[in-house]
């Protein structure tokens, strides 16, 4: 679930960015994927409220509800309005995150087409190949932007994408943001302990 509220897991990222512990790098593909999910979620919210209104009106009349102070029209949300409000929350979060956003100029289409026909990750033989193209683009962006020498943390729970990023020991994968946060906190604690011993 996407949650950009003050105490959410995602908002902790902003704290780590502001303290200089991490720098966020996102593929423009990831940004577009998040926007797509936000739009879909806002549509689902509006549909759920409309459904709730419909169910309530099966139980009692609109007139009775109005007499007791329940305004069922409040449940008729404007889909476009709430999509835009939801996207505004995302844009504000992104602004506070201040990420480097990798664009498509880093992508080498020849490499991706070769990987596709050679069935190299993320194009593994048992999966629907067409759906793996976004992962291939993201992995290609990571390889082009960071190479194999720069140490980077990648939050990803997709084995095909992990393999496609290459086998660099400097690419450290975490399945969740929580795992990344724990690693940062452990490293920070170890650093403080070493510093205190000196």
Where are these regions (language model features)?
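Active-site-proximal, substrate-binding regions of enzyme catalytic domains
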Residues: 2-151, 159-198
């Amino acid at each position: 679930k996407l949650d950009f509220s003050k105490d959410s897991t995602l908002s902790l990222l902003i704290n780590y960015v502001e303290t200089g512990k991490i720098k966020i790098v996102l593929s423009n593909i990831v940004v577009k994927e998040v926007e797509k999910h936000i739009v879909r979620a806002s549509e689902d919210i509006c549909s759920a409220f409309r459904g709730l209104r419909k169910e309530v009106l099966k139980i009692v009349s609109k007139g009775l509800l109005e007499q007791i102070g329940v305004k069922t029209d409040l449940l008729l949300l404007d889909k476009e309005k709430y999509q835009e409000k939801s996207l505004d929350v995302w844009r504000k979060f992104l602004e506070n995150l201040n990420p480097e956003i990798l664009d498509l100029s880093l992508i080498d289409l020849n490499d991706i087409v070769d990987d596709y026909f050679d069935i190299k990750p993320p194009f593994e033989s048992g999966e629907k190949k067409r759906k793996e193209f976004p992962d291939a683009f993201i992995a290609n962006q990571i390889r082009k932007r960071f190479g194999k020498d720069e140490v980077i943390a990648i939050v990803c729970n997709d084995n095909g994408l992990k393999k496609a990023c290459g086998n660099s020991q400097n690419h450290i994968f975490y399945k969740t943001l929580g795992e990344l946060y724990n690693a940062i906190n452990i490293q920070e604690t170890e650093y403080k302990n070493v510093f205190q011993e000196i």
